[in-house]
């Protein structure tokens, strides 16, 4: 299929009962990763996890990703991606966290990318080497009246003018599945 790069969700970071950020739903490497494909470990961070020490969180995430790579023979990783559904109210702590992630990644010769949702295009971009615009989930998949919940260009169109002046290099992620 000509796939040269795979974004692989390694784990989520969620708040435990005490409000501490902890890893959850860690990937179980049942088979080896393909050796001829660039693997980009991706970590989903819940916004409420950004209330604590963001530098420590960044350090722990990078260390966990690197340990998972080593344990599972995932070699030559050049980039880590952070996925977070941040909003205007969580933008500042997210950007602080992303700056800590950027510093941590660069100290280890890694690049950092961030997912960018359509609604986030209207905000200042987070600190990152690049972004990946998520061109999917534009509708409500639980609403039977929504005919194109995965990608409806009509729903995406209001956000597209923000691309012209967006200050972060972006590539686009499109859905590659049907139902």
What would you call each of these model-derived segments?
Residues 5, 55, 63, 78, ...:
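Context-gated lysine
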Residues 1-10, 16:
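N-terminal mature-domain "stem" immediately C-terminal to a signal peptide or N-terminal signal-anchor/transmembrane
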